[in-house]
């Protein structure tokens, strides 16, 4: 019969404190994006987060290799993984609502900060200093923040292109607005991506594989 191991004093060892942090993160898959839009395929927050992290990492590499920059790709990608984590608690507030007024935008920002704090507090205390920078997006340079924001917009544009490729004109205006907003950022790394990588998103699988 298995026995519970005991300490030298004979008492059973103390069970480690449990944490809900990653269980909460896993709930991203249940949070839909584009909730006010008619979609041919739904997209959840987990998918968007993973794609944004990939894009952010690539943009940082472009910054370093092609434009002589010094963006920290690993740190930016980690921040991208958590950039929408507060929406686990707040939900994905539609953009027209979030930015309806300056007061609404500021109110949502405060709610977002509170949600970030709640998530951080779910971590075991010794881990909080290590994960805090990624979870709160702290310690990024202005360039790194710009690249992360550009990656977020690129993910939205890619979603629009995917919907348009399926014949869904519901995303025509959103695609134009997101594309204009990205161009207004004057981000050469994103401009390079748009010219070099984005056209392939309109291709079929056979075209992508050269069949």
Question: Where on the chain are the PLM-derived regions?
Answer:
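Alpha-helical, largely C-terminal catalytic domains
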Residues: 1-211
